[in-house]
């Protein structure tokens, strides 16, 4: 269905083909047997998070292993935090001691995981530990420190809810801002980025907050159905007595006002994120950082003033995601600024004049547009500016590809 939607956007369709979109149709396979520990880690990464695996595998070899292990370690920690079947008094000591297990050969955890992939990770965590211990002291120190701090933060918020905006910032710092801080230190330790990244904790934190707040906003329905609340009470309580009310159509207007309020808050991190990315030098690191950030502002644009957030799943089209990846891989920071401008500009034109947050929302969006124009030296116009295509050829390719997929199935291109 996703490729059919993209037929109306030939630029997206070509990008889908270029980045090998047919992988998304392949079922998740079982892990291969008799793998070395490092190979096992990469197999699990590819199986559990194809999008993250995609950007990791594009990195320099000196950086790739460290970030793969960093991801799996934090995924293991998250598996313990998220398992709602385990009593809190049982879970907390496992969380807070998890980082020490990184220095214990053979360390693994049983009794956690909401699905087979999560169970596979923590029950075979000794394989991750083995590769971790071979990374070198610099990387190990960073990963251990971030894991310890994140575990303590998770433990804190397992015992209380998010009420105020400062608490929302703190929660997002623990679960995502610390990831940004760790990544910056890893970038510097690899020698691929400057010393500035070793101490850029605030900027790195805001990169993480921008991503995490976007996820929390988008995932309203999934979280509320699981009896989880990550929207800060001080915000939603201005619009309703009970957060779950927003699922009912009669509360649509206050629901949208609350949604737009939180999106406006998330947008406050965008300028710092753009400044952070402007300091990156390595092309693969730029791609690694820029793709998720552009996806985030694209997702905020899709969610803004959209009541579907409260009734279903809102996300940018698969073809549009492919176009973002293709554009950034082709043009790096130039495409990043262009895309940020486009999404900010589109969102600004959707702001309802009577929305309570309208003035602040427009201020944030105009600031993003202004900075992007300054960085580029020109004002972008349309998505099709990113990559020059022969549109007759693209349309012909799209139609031909759709025919082949309809005739031979979605994995046709992966067989070529």
UniProtKB/Swiss-Prot annotation:
Q: Which GO terms describe its biological process?
A: cholesterol biosynthetic process; farnesyl diphosphate metabolic process; isoprenoid biosynthetic process
Give the CC-aspect GO terms. endoplasmic reticulum membrane
Positions of transmembrane segments: 285-304, 386-406
Pathway the protein acts in = Terpene metabolism; lanosterol biosynthesis; lanosterol from farnesyl diphosphate: step 1/3
Q: Which cofactors are reported in the record for this sequence? A: Mg(2+)
Molecular functions (GO terms): squalene synthase [NAD(P)H] activity
Is Nucleus among the key words of this record?
no
Please report which protein family the annotation says this sequence is part of. Answer: Belongs to the phytoene/squalene synthase family.
Name by which UniProt lists this protein: Squalene synthase
- Organism of this sequence: Dictyostelium discoideum (Social amoeba)
């Amino acid at each position: 269905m996703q490729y059919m939607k993209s037929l109306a956007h030939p630029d997206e369709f070509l990008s889908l083909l270029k980045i090998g979109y047919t992988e998304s149709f392949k079922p998740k396979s079982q892990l291969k047997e008799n793998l070395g520990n490092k190979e096992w880690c990469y197999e699990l990464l590819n199986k559990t998070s194809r999008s993250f695996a995609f950007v990791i595998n594009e990195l320099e070899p000196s950086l790739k292993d460290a970030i793969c292990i960093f991801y799996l370690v934090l995924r293991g920690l998250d598996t313990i935090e998220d398992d709602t079947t385990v009593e809190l008094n049982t879970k907390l000591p496992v969380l807070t001691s998890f980082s020490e297990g990184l220095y214990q050969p053979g360390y693994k955890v049983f009794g956690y995981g909401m699905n087979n992939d999560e169970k596979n990770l923590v029950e075979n965590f000794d394989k991750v530990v083995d590769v971790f211990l071979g990374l070198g002291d610099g990387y190990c120190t960073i990963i251990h420190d971030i894991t310890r701090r994140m575990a303590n933060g998770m433990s804190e918020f397992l015992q209380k809810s998010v009420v105020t905006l400062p608490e929302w910032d703190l929660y997002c710092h623990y679960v995502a801002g610390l990831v940004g801080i760790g990544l910056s230190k890893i970038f510097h330790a690899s020698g691929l980025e400057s010393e500035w990244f070793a101490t850029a904790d605030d900027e790195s934190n805001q990169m993480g907050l921008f991503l995490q707040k976007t996820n929390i906003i988008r995932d309203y329905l999934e979280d509320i159905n699981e009896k989880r609340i990550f929207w800060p009470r001080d915000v939603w309580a201005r619009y309703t007595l009970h957060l779950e009310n927003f699922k009912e159509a009669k509360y649509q207007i206050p629901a949208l006002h609350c949604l737009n309020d939180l999106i406006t808050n998330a947008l406050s991190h965008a300028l710092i994120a753009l400044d952070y990315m402007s300091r990156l030098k390595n092309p693969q690191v730029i791609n690694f950082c820029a793709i998720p950030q552009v996806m985030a502002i694209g997702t905020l644009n899709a969610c803004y003033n959209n009541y579907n957030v409260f009734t279903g799943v809102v996300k940018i089209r698969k073809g549009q995601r492919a176009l973002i990846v293709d554009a950034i891989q082709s043009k790096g920071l130039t495409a990043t600024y262009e895309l940020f401008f486009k999404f900010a500009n589109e969102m600004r034109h959707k702001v309802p004049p009577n929305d309570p947050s309208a003035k602040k929302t427009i201020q944030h969006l105009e600031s993003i547009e202004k900075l992007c124009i300054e960085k580029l030296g020109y004002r972008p116009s349309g998505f099709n500016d990113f990559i020059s295509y022969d549109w007759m050829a693209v349309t012909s390719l799209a139609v031909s590809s759709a025919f082949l997929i309809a005739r031979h199935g979605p994995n046709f291109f992966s067989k070529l």
